[in-house]
Each structure stands twice: as C-alpha cells, then as structure tokens.
Amino acid sequence: MKKRFLSLVVSFFCVCSSLIGVGCQGTGTGTSATTKTPPEYTQNSEQKFVFWSYAPTDGIYRQNGEEFYSGEDFRTEEQYQMYKDVGFNMLHLSSTVRADNVSSKAEYDANNLAALAAANNVGFDQIIISDWRIAAVLSKTTGGLIGRDKMFPNEAALDAYIAECISYYKDIEGVNAFNVGDEPRMDQLEAFGQVYQSIGRVWPEAYRFYNFFGGIENEEAFGRIVPREGQSRWDAAKELYEEYIYTAIDCMGGDIPYLSFDRYPLIASGVHVEYFPTLEILAKICKQKGMELYAWTQSCEMYSGSTLIYRKVNRTDVQWMNNSLLGFGVSGIGCFTYSTTDWTNGEIFADGGSLLTYDHEKTEIYDYYQEICARNQDFASVILNFDYRGCRTYSVSNSPIDVGHVKGVDNTHVFKAISDVSIDKGCALVTELYDTKTRNSMYMIMNAIDTQVKGSKAYQTTTVTFDNQYSHVLVFKNAINEPYTVELKNHKLEIEQTPGEAVYVIPY
C-alpha cells in the first residue's frame, strides 16, 4: 500500500471556529482546547499523487471518420513542459506516437523519435506508449489468445509477438511504461490478462498502465443482468460489476498494484447515479486487495451529435470531483481530456471545453486543474497516510434539489469514531479513511449537491457527532494543507458548506 511517514514536529496550528467558504464550529460545552495535542503530519517528497492526461497531439484530429489538421505538430518540448506545468507527472502518449501506421522500425523512428526525445528532455516519472497493433489483437478477441484454435499456440508464441512489437520503442530513452489497454469487456478479460502478463515477462521493467470500465448497468460490457429471486436489478448489476473487476484481477495474475477506471459524474443535467456506487465498489475492492485506486476525471465538454453528454466544468465542479475522489482514497487522477482525444468515434469534443483548445491554447480549465494538482501534492503528506474504509450518504426527504445520485451506495458501513450525522438540506457524503500506523481516523465530509442546479448555492449545515472519547478535531478544508483545530462541544461538529466543498477531519 501507500508509503507512510509520520513524525512529531512543531507545526503551526490554530484553534478556529470559522473559515471562509467552509465554516466549522463546536457546539455546547467542552474541555479546553489546550488539553490535547493534535496529530501532526509532515511534508515528505516521497509521497505524491500520480497525475496524467492525454499528451499534446501531432495536430491531426480524427473524429467520426473525418480528419483535419490544426496546422502544427504540438509534440514539442515547449508543449510537453506546458503539460507538465499542470502538475502532470505521467505522460500518456495515446495515439500521438504510433507503430501501427509504419512498416519498419526505421519509419517508426523517423515519425516519432523527435517527439519522444522532446518528452524525455522535459522529464516524467512515466512515459506511456500505446501500441495499436496489440490493441487490435485484443479488440478482435473473445476468450483467450493462447491454445488450440487460438491466435497463439502457446505462451512463448505470444511473448515472441509482444517482443517484436515492443522492439520498436522498448529501448528508446525515457520510454518506460506500456498502455495494456482501455475498458476490456468481460469476454475480453482472459486475453487482456494474457497480454498484461506477457508484457511483464518480456519487458519486466516497464510500468504497465490499464483502465477498466467504470459504471454498473452495462450489459454490453459485462453481460446480462439477471437478478436472483428477491434481488433487485440494481443489486444484481452491482454484483455483476464486482464480478467483472474480480475476474480482471484474476486474469491479470491476481496481484496487480492498482485499479483504474473512468466514470464521469457531471452529465448535461445533474450527477450520474452510478458515480458514487462505482467509487464505493472499487474502493472496497482496493481495500480488500491492498491496491491503489486511480480514476480518470472529467475535464471535457462532450457531445454525441448535437446532444450534450458531459457538461463543461467550472472551478466548483473540479473541486466537487476532487473532494469526492480523495474521500474514496484515490491516489492517481487522470484528466479526460487535455485538448481533445485525437481519435474519436461517435463523440464530439467542444473546442475550448478542455484544458486546451485544438490549437493548444490554455483555457480556464487548465488553471483549475493546475490549482488542484498543486493542492493535492501539498496535501499528499497527510492524506496518503490514510486508506479508505467505508462511506455513507445522507439526504433530506422530499428535497426540492435532486439528491438521487447519492442513494445508490450500500449505506451499511459503521463509522469507527462517528455516532451520528444530520443535515438540514440537500445531501452529503461522508467517507472514512484510516491510518494503520498511528490508528488515526480521517473523515471526508462533503456537500454532495450538484453545483449547477437551481437553488444549490445556499449553505448546507452538516452536524457530526463523534464518540465520547473525542474532544477535538484537526480540520483541513478542501484538501488544502493548512490545518486548524476545533474544540468539540458535546462531541459535535457543525459544518457549513456550499456544494462541492469538503472538510477532512481527524478526531482526537
């Protein structure tokens, strides 16, 4: 699991009763604020989040069978530096560097070496290569790749094919990661796992990147949803999704370092009802298996034809998504997308609806994610000591504001240090994280109302009652590493928040 570092040093803490944007205060009577020392976490450069997006493009965009050229190849050192300046420490080249459109290693080098050298000069923890020759093998395969009447007669034959493919780029300076694939269906998992393990054999030093479907009711990907007698369709769908993830892990050898998924929450109107349940399921599995959790998050405005699917995000939306991800223990975050995906089918990405325009000019979304990346890396020395344990959601009956998106989680988790939570309007998400080394609990308490619905701007008050042994909480607002302490009165903490705001509290 995550590397943990804890030391007791003198830090600046203050006893606060209010904070701009997120107000926290104790209620009633209690002990003096000076009687207990708050837990203290120090900066450590070895603790950090993983951030990435799709790389700057070659200026060629292919959408729905049509191709157009922006007039400039953006695979330059200047553009890679601008990408890194967001806070991205992993470079996902996707289809900007390709091996499927060349006939020789020499042609591959002629097309791509300059771009790869520029990326290497900037410096990234990982530079991820995709190989659409291998992706094509996976996309056409159901069942496994190895055996009688299969594509490869034995494991050695598969390894030889993979070795031939990766020989184009394996020894290029800076290239140290391979994109195994994206969103394999249930019937492709055996082949997906075989390729994953083959890469591990023929290129053992490579970081292997992969991504799974995020979303629950997807019969095309997972198979038919067939409820048992007395079981709801929703519960059957969640069970099938869990089976999909467990099967993927088994097919990949049973010991993988992380799960990665995408499930973009902010649809044209409202929040997707599968977002929190998907996070809950994956965070639970990561907890069981001792894995990290990575997530692609929403940074694009996307249409299907003329129909808006995912809305353009604002600063509050980005904060809403970030708090929700950190609350579930996510330690790697990718932005979908950077300028736009350079190869789409059936999807249209609005120019200016992502971090960059088609011409790679910055938008305000670039600034939002630059702020979030810096904030999270500063907070890493605190939150990356904690692992996800469980969650609950809360909503007001007959709310005039839609709260349906919080109702799909199990809500069976019992908090270690909280005895009661109440809200005065809307909906809230509370997640529990735990530091096994210090035995500290952390709670992420978030106003989960959609930030863009009518009437959502008013403050929501959440009252949290902690168990009797706790007299104080250490508070971090919106993942900002500027802690302050609050003395609990009658063991209660009142929090005023607008949508998307969250506090991370450690009771002591």
Question: What does each model-identified segment do?
Answer:
Residues T316-A374, D387-S397:
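Aromatic/acidic polysaccharide-binding cleft in carbohydrate-active enzymes
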Residues S397-Q469:
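Carbohydrate-binding surface patches
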Residues Y54, I129-D131, Y196-E242, Q288-S304, ...:
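Aromatic-lined carbohydrate-recognition surfaces of secreted/lumenal glycan-active proteins
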Residues T34-S94, W132-R133:
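Boundary/entry segment of secreted carbohydrate-active catalytic domains
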Residues A136-S139, E219-E220, L282-T316, D351, ...:
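Active-site clefts of carbohydrate-active enzymes
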